[in-house]
Amino acid sequence: MYDVVDLTPTYSPTLKPMLSQQYQTVPPFIIPPNDPNSPSPLSSPSLLSLHQIQMHHQQQLQLLQQQQQQLQQQHQNQVVNQPIQPLQPQPSAFLLNHPNTITTPPLQPMMTPNTIISINSLPPTTTTTTTTTTTTTIPNNNNNITLSPQHHHGQQQHHQHPHLRVDISNNNNSVVDQLPQQQQTNVNNNNNNNNNNNNNNNSNNNNNNNNDFSTPNSFSVPTTPMVAPQMQFPQPPPPLSALNTPNNSTSNPTTPRNERDLLRRLAVANSNNNLNNNLNNLNNNNNNNNNNNNNNNNNNNNNSNNNNINNNNNINNNNNLNNNNLNNNNLPIIQPLNLNNNNNNNNNNNNNNNNNLINPFLNEAIDEQVVPKGSTSPLITSSKKRIKLNV
């Protein structure tokens, strides 16, 4: 009666348990037809039965459409054959709400042309509307913006249409335009007041911006970024055992010892010359600043006596030179410069003559140079006192 099916699970994806047809059921979304003559889907649940159910529904729809068309045709035939009867007048909602203002005759089954609806009195429809004007002020930094809806003199009923009007008063635009110019005039006035008061410290600070430092220790920032070059190592690096000191016997320098000493002296001399040039440039800049300050002081003190002007210039020059020496922090403070001269014209000459005294590196005098034995060139020399440098 029943088919016995082995439902033992297997690991093969191709083998699946098979069920007989009598255990299969119809999905719940399929509704069987109401016609008792049609085959039931429970008896033959197959694609053919589903197709038959769909065909049955289509036939039922066609029958319903035909019946509807027949009813419409019958209705049209009845309307054409029967005479048209006039409609009875129906009272409106206004008449029901206002029975005293409008009088109507009693309802009659048939309306005749002689029937007249008499209207005794109608209430006049008067509408009044009050509109309010509101003004809102939004404070801004420089402009006052006033928001106010327009006021309509006409009357409206239950509808308000506010129109937004923006009033911008540009009262402060002139002040805004004059701000940069006003700031500039204030700066100029401050400079004039400082010059009239002979404030030497402020004049030095103002003149420092015009200094042209051409030394390596300058305030200027390079525009192009400094990029380290890519070092190429065609050969492998030497082992740590090969990195010995020059005094070790295993080292084989490419240049003799005397030539290396000469190169070291040349390097020290070049560094001293560069330092001399830097100090000379700094002294020249200081002298230029002093001359500019003297000119400003002379122009501001035209009304005073000549003797007082000369004395003030000498005092101001000394103070300015000392202040400049203390304010220049880029170069090392070596020795106090011998620049306390009363005459401005002699500053450059004194600086050129005192270059050897400014540099402390040249204070160590080199002893008498002795030509070593076996050397034919007098340039390759040695000294009794050597300067130890980490070269």
UniProtKB/Swiss-Prot annotation:
Compositional bias (Low complexity): 118-149, 186-211, 244-256
Region described as Disordered: spans on this chain: 118-162, 184-258, 272-327, 337-356
Biased composition (Polar residues): 212-223
Domain of life: Eukaryota
Basic residues compositional bias, start-end: 150-162
Protein name, per record: Uncharacterized protein DDB_G0286175
Native species: Dictyostelium discoideum
